[in-house]
Amino acid sequence: MSVAYEGLNDCVIYDFETLSVDVNRGVVLSLGLLTFSRARFTNNPYSYEELLDSSVSIKYDVKKQVEVYDRKISKSTLDWWNNQPKETTAAVMVPSENDKDISETYNFFVQNVNINNLKTVFSRGNTFDIPFFEGILNDTGKKVPYPFWMVRDTRSFLDGLLWGSDVKNDYIPEGCAEKFFKHDARHDCVMDVMRMQTVIQNL
């Protein structure tokens, strides 16, 4: 990273993989998170690899969510995961002794985000990832560590900038397709930042 931008990551994007679309009580599998600076989009653009290396994730204990927090698994969502390629599901669906309690979500976030420097919080969909995050913090006695007015969603960001074109908000930027791993929370964050960067560069 250029020294000029060292420590100036003022944006974060996060993404959940889940076992339900119920944002209030659904079980979460993993959370991916990536901090970045929009100032770099034109002056010192990111590579896919740099963003991926900068991203972090936490994988959750599913059983404990059900037994302790009364969170629910959706059969239709579980069936969907079971129909995905094994290489997609292995990393997120197979239980591990390293899986974390959802109570660790708050510390995971604040340890990986410079809250004092934060200006914008992105998710792909603010009716999905954001309420999942807020609900988990509520379940574990924590408050959301950023004000509501920082929140944006990448779909609206991209739709606005792509208005009048035939390009969709889920397009894959040139050179990224072979690097992208579907349904991986870290890769989902990286891809949305690459989408925003590419659109800004082409304005």
Give the role of each language-model region.
Residues 113, 127-149:
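Substrate-recognition/cap helix-loop segment adjacent to the acidic, metal-dependent catalytic center
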Residues 117-127, 131-132, 169-203:
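Acidic, Mg2+-coordinating catalytic module of metal-dependent nucleases/exonucleases
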Residues 2, 6-12, 17-123:
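Conserved non-catalytic scaffold segment of RNase H-like nuclease domains
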